[in-house]
């Protein structure tokens, strides 16, 4: 699994040098799951980077601080973990109004990650509902984690707090993707042969279930205008769905 910030033009990417490594802790935490490092993701604006460290944990890293740390140390002794491993403590020293690192315990093996950012003028599809538990501001940044037990947990990136627990899949959540239009529509792909569409602006209510795959669903992606969703799975077929 690889991830680029949205502003990066993949066609312009040339052979690049390594600037650093993020290393998972060696010792297990309280005998939790193993050291699986299966997924990474950038926030849409490049402000944060998330990666699954194993042991059921995800690390949220302010990318500008992380990159500064790498450039400060340079590329020498790249295999020396002591020089490039990020601290497990909050990197801002407790100062307010600065991006902070967070270690999130997701409660199960993490298979998928996705960032979502809010655009206030994008209203919930459920227009008749006047009251919502959550009202996301313009600067809202969320992280969705897909777990081995079929659950999806939604976290506030800035505080590291759990906001929503989406429960409907019966198997591993293999992939997650947010609509790129800022509507906070989330789609999940699962081994239960289905995709589910969630409206986070409607407190995470599930809008619809998409079926058509005969086997596990591995990955899904929105079109740039958020009107179409494509998915692939073990059945060796691409399934396209129009969401508008």
Model-derived regions: residue spans:
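WD40/WD-repeat beta-propeller blade-loop signature
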Residues: 36, 45, 100, 109, ...
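A conserved positional marker within WD40/Gbeta-like beta-propeller blades
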Residues: 57, 151, 170, 193-196, ...
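WD40-repeat beta-propellers
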Residues: 58-63, 152-155, 176, 195-199, ...
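Conserved strand-to-loop turn within each blade of WD40 beta-propeller repeats
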Residues: 52-55, 146-149, 188-192, 232-235
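Intrinsically disordered, low-complexity acidic/Ser/Thr/Pro-rich linker and tail segments
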Residues: 1-39, 65-99, 120-133
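Hydrophobic beta-strand positions that form the internal "hydrophobic ladder"
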Residues: 49, 143, 185-186, 229
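WD40/WD-repeat beta-propeller blade N-cap
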Residues: 29-37, 75-78, 104-110, 167-173, ...
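Loop/turn segments within WD40 beta-propeller blades
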Residues: 41-46, 114-120, 134-140, 177-183, ...
């Amino acid at each position: 699994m690889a991830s680029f910030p949205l502003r990066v033009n993949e066609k312009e990417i040339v052979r690049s040098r390594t600037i650093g490594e993020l290393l998972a802790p060696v010792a297990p935490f309280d005998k939790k799951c193993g050291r699986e490092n299966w997924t990474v993701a950038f926030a849409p604006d490049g402000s944060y980077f998330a990666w699954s460290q194993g042991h059921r944990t995800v690390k949220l890293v302010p990318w500008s601080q992380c990159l500064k740390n790498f450039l400060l140390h340079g590329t020498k002794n790249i295999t020396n973990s002591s020089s490039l491993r990020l601290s497990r403590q909050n990197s801002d020293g407790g100062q307010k109004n600065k991006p902070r690192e967070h270690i999130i315990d997701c409660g199960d093996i993490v298979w998928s990650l996705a960032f979502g950012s809010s655009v206030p003028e994008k209203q919930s599809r459920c227009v008749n509902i006047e009251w919502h538990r959550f009202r996301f501001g313009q600067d809202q940044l969320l992280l969705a984690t897909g777990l081995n037990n079929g659950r999806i947990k939604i976290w506030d990136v800035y505080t590291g707090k759990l906001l929503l627990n989406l429960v409907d899949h019966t198997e591993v959540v293999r992939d997650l993707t947010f609509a790129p239009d800022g509507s906070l529509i989330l789609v999940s792909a699962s081994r239960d042969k289905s995709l589910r569409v969630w409206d986070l602006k409607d407190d995470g209510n599930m809008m619809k279930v998409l079926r058509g795959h005969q086997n596990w669903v591995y990955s899904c992606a929105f079109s740039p205008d958020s009107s179409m969703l494509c998915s692939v799975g073990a059945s060796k077929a691409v399934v396209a769905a129009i969401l508008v």
